[in-house]
């Protein structure tokens, strides 16, 4: 979920968190996943407007049987670059007649690839980073690979878990929490790998998910009760149970030591176990998008424009850059 730039309607939890009696400062410092809590304190020191409830990142889902049929192994997926993935994907199209790769989220495709060069899609101060050489370069790459049939976009399928389940695409990049929508009927083995990145660029893997907030328009007693509920909901056992039953990642490191998580990781047939291991490793490259006004609207624009450009509806890269920048600017300025 996208955080809004407007936070005054939610309570600053710092006074509770730092309290000697009921606080959880040490837990947040030592046990919560740092990148999950950073997102909720991005407004400055001693300004914490919520705590993470569930978080996901993105992973690469691969049809292992088809991959091997093409002459590759899962070793080829280690530290995978888009350049290598394009080679594999073109072979999938040429030999199997299916696309080799797609992004489940076209907005994440643009935002994460832009972040590989250290740029935020829209900065907290409202600066839009679409008009640059890196955006032009990777968008032209994705267009070329989509036009050749190696890559594809979601389109009318809405999500790529459907085509993947039906073996109509070799691999896709999607949420670590989306595996429940994959139904392969045991017809093929699923491999899970870290998402690809461009050669020579930084890895950038988005983190998303729900957080818990307390509103300002309730009594002090109600706010404190809500804070105690947040503590309860995010304790080690509860974050482990909630995460493993929904496919999300626990928000505490200590969850890995619970029987709930241990049992799943020990189960070699568990797809969640494969995802957990990859996603947990990916967190060292995780980032979050800055909280901006009308964030979801801006995402919708880049989603639509990305797909229009790579599919060929928008034919010129400068038209894509200029139109997208203009529409995003209008969107984030709208009150």
Per-region residue spans from a language model:
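Short, solvent-exposed loop/beta-turn-alpha elements that line the ligand-binding surface or hinge
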Residues: 14-31, 77-78, 95, 119-137, ...
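Extracytoplasmic/periplasmic substrate-recognition and gating elements
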Residues: 144, 184-253
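Short helix-initiation/N-cap motifs at beta->coil->alpha
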Residues: 80-84, 152-165
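Hinge/lid segment of periplasmic solute-binding proteins
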Residues: 2-57, 191-193, 263, 277
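C-terminal capping/gating helix-and-loop segments adjacent to ligand/active sites or protein-protein/ligand interfaces
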Residues: 270-327
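A ligand-binding cleft/hinge motif common to bilobed small-molecule-binding domains
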Residues: 2-5, 176-188
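Alpha-to-beta junction loops
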Residues: 1, 9, 166-175
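Glycine-centered hinge/linker elements that transmit conformational signals in sensory
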Residues: 86-91, 125-155
């Amino acid at each position: 979920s996208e955080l809004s730039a407007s936070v005054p309607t939610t309570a600053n939890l710092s006074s509770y968190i730092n309290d000697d009696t009921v606080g959880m400062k040490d837990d947040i410092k030592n046990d919560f996943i740092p990148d999950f809590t950073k997102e909720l304190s991005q407004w400055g020191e001693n300004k914490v407007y919520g705590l993470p409830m569930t978080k996901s990142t993105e992973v690469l889902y691969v049809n292992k049987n088809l991959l091997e049929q093409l002459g590759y192994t899962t070793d080829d997926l280690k530290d995978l670059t888009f350049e290598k993935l394009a080679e594999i994907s073109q072979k999938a199209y040429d030999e199997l007649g299916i696309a080799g790769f797609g992004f489940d989220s076209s907005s994440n495709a643009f935002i994460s690839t832009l972040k590989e060069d250290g740029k935020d899609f829209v900065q907290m101060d409202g600066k839009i980073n679409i008009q640059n050489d890196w955006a032009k370069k990777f968008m032209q790459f994705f267009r070329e690979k989509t036009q050749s049939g190696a890559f594809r976009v979601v389109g009318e399928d809405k999500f790529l878990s459907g085509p993947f389940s039906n073996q109509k695409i070799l691999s896709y990049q999607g949420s670590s929490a989306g595996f429940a929508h994959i139904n392969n009927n045991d017809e093929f083995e699923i491999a899970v790998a870290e998402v690809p990145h461009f050669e020579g660029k930084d890895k950038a893997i988005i983190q998303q998910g729900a957080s818990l907030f307390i509103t300002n328009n309730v009594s002090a007693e109600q706010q404190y009760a809500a804070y105690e509920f947040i503590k309860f909901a995010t304790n080690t056992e509860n974050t482990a149970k909630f995460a493993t039953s929904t496919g999300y990642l626990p928000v505490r490191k200590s969850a890995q030591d619970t029987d709930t998580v241990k049992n799943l990781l020990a189960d070699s047939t568990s797809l969640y176990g494969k995802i957990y291991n990859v996603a947990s490793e990916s967190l060292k490259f995780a980032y979050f998008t800055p909280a901006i006004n009308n964030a979801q609207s801006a995402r919708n624009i880049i989603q639509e424009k990305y797909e229009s450009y790579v599919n060929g509806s928008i034919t010129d890269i400068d038209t894509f850059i200029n139109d997208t920048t203009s529409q995003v600017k209008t969107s984030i300025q709208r009150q």
